[in-house]
Regions:
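Residues forming the flavin
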Residues: 1-414, 463-466, 477, 482-498, ...
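C-terminal auxiliary extensions adjacent to catalytic cores
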Residues: 390-446
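A broadly conserved sequence feature marking short terminus-proximal activation segments
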Residues: 433-496
Length: 549
């Protein structure tokens, strides 16, 4: 911790992140005891500003938390009406019938939602119960007690100059202390990353795996719109270059969510995930749907894909990791929000019981037991082998092997046991000389768009006078190692055009970080083959401003 003197505020529970996990925890705590002092700190300009998800929501988490959510006006307005799955070739598609799919793949009873709007509604429910929610409050540091337990966080520091010195409007922020601190920052949160390393919470676990999810909202011709229709695809354009797939969700008001996910364990450093997404929209099936329509929003976010075997230990003295800070996405279902909500509820119940017993700043072991042995663990354990089988054997073989494994897991066993993930996504990156460059067609400005134009539809903004929140452990590595060895992959894997290599006045290569473009996806922190880029929080309120993602 720095030597800066700060004011302090005391709470029973301090929650970092107003996503589905953090808000569920806050709501459940106040349901259990209205007198508990609970605060939620959100780095976005408002609740929902940094929320990006598909999303087809399994309402089981909401059912458990707020059983009368329908009566209370939760924005779950579009039930899934039909479910389609296609294998794509470059010029055609093959529909996979639903009947051989394991039952867990069925979307009956689920809803197409904007998770940003769901979180905004959840925040209203939390505030009605007396939860304090502070948006625009980036949490930049953990606060530790003398015994090594987590004591709280530093939030609200802003006004630094670009060199890190205090500017004329500098505010040091505050220390918010709690009997327990919940980290619900989403995927690859900077504080969760620190806590996992400090307490060695990943010891004995498989490496976490990730995907990069990119999403656009389109307004399309009403004649083509089918409210409640859900489509997923695999195959082209990724084929054998990488794992991943797409989603097309028809919500209301003639709007469609069009998204594309690239698994970040791809080997070819020439691969350009954003351009794979843009190319996907030119497939005849997709182009026919979108032609004549208008893209109205864009965003990107990393997704945790490691599943059951990659979940770290979730508790340390005084702190618990919730939701995607742990990694609770069911990869074949492409769903994690329900588990995030259930994790928040479980953490709240464990903390409430501890506080009732007069405890504080210890390990909430009951929470971890609930997650691993309860509904979340059951959901993730059944599908634990799908991602590693895909990585090891490719798309076609893994569809058969993974499908078979999911079927046997519904009966309580697996012939595969638990398959290892192997390398981290950064370690999986191959050398440029060992892989062929990939030629991507130029965006046409109608169906496909250049990256910087699309980033403007994320409404991202960062105060330019502050220190860059994207830092390098060694400033020489991008040019001395990553460029000659991997052809500078950051200039391609970033979906916002943050990184580029330019020539300086002497004609030498120079690495440039355009941090103002950042949409907080965290891909650079994950995929950089040298693990040299570190994502930290900018000052509060900065970043994307997603309206309905």
């Amino acid at each position: 911790m720095s030597d800066t003197t700060r004011e302090t505020m005391e709470y029973d529970v301090v929650i970092v992140g107003a996503g589905p996990a953090g808000l569920s925890a806050a709501i459940r705590l106040k349901q259990l005891d209205a007198d508990l002092e609970v605060v939620v700190l959100e780095k976005g300009s408002e609740v929902g500003a940094h929320i990006l998800s598909g999303a087809v929501l399994d309402p089981c988490g909401l059912d458990a938390l707020i059983p009368d959510w329908k009566e209370k006006g939760a924005p779950l307005n579009v039930p899934v009406k039909d479910d389609n799955f296609y294998m794509l070739g470059e010029a055609g598609q093959l529909r996979i019938p639903n009947f051989p799919m394991p039952p867990l793949m069925n979307n009956h009873g689920n809803y197409i939602v904007s998770m940003g709007n769901v979180c905004r509604w959840m925040a209203e429910q939390a505030e009605e119960l007396g939860v304090e929610i502070f948006p625009g409050m980036a949490c930049s540091e953990m606060v530790y007690a003398e015994d090594g337990s987590v004591k709280g966080v530093v939030a609200g520091e802003f006004g630094k100059n670009a060199d890190g010195t205090p500017g004329p409007a500098y505010e040091p922020g505050m220390e918010l202390h709690g009997k327990y601190v919940f980290l619900s920052e989403g995927v690859r949160g900077s504080l969760a990353k620190e806590v996992i390393a400090k307490y060695d919470l990943s010891a004995g676990k498989e490496p976490q795996k990730f995907g990069l999810g990119m999403k656009e909202i389109w307004e399309i011709d009403p004649a083509k719109h089918k409210e409640g229709s859900v489509t997923h695809t695999m195959g082209w354009p990724l084929n054998f270059n990488a794992g991943g797939g797409s989603f097309i969700y028809h919500l209301d008001n003639n709007q469609v969510y069009v998204g594309f996910v690239v698994h970040l364990n791809y080997e070819n450093p020439h691969l350009y995930p954003y351009m794979e997404f843009q190319r996907f929209k030119h497939h005849p099936m997709v182009a026919k749907l979108l032609e004549g329509g208008k893209r109205v929003a864009y965003g990107a976010r990393a997704i945790s894909e490691g599943g059951y075997q990659s979940m770290p230990k979730m508790v340390a003295p005084g702190v618990a990791l919730l939701g995607c800070s742990v990694g609770m996405v069911n990869v074949p279902r492409i769903k994690g929000n329900h588990n995030a909500m259930l994790s928040g509820k479980a953490a709240a119940e464990a903390a409430h019981a501890a506080i009732q017993d007069g405890r504080a700043s210890d390990e909430l072991t009951a929470y971890e037991t609930d997650v691993r042995e309860g509904a979340i663990g059951e959901d993730l354990k059944k599908v634990r082998n799908v991602k590693p089988l895909w990585s090891k054997y490719g798309l076609t073989a893994s569809l058969m092997l993974g499908g078979f494994d999911m079927w046997t897991n519904t009966m309580g066993f697996s012939l595969f046991g638990t398959v290892s993930h192997g390398k981290s996504d950064a370690e999986a990156t191959g050398k440029a000389a060992d892989h062929k460059p990939i030629d991507y067609p130029k965006p046409d400005g109608k169906l496909s768009f250049d990256r910087l134009t699309n980033v403007s539809f994320a409404a991202t903004n960062h105060e330019e006078s502050q220190p860059a929140h994207l830092t390098l452990k060694d400033a020489s590595i991008p040019v001395s190692i990553n460029l000659p060895t991997y052809d500078g992959p950051s200039q391609r894997y970033c979906p916002a055009g943050v990184y580029e290599f330019v020539k300086d006045e002497s004609g030498d290569d120079k690495f440039v970080i355009n941090f103002q473009n950042c949409v907080h996806c965290k891909t650079c922190d994950i995929k950089d083959p040298s693990q040299n880029i570190v994502w930290t929080v900018p000052q509060g309120g900065d970043g994307p401003n997603y309206p309905n993602m």
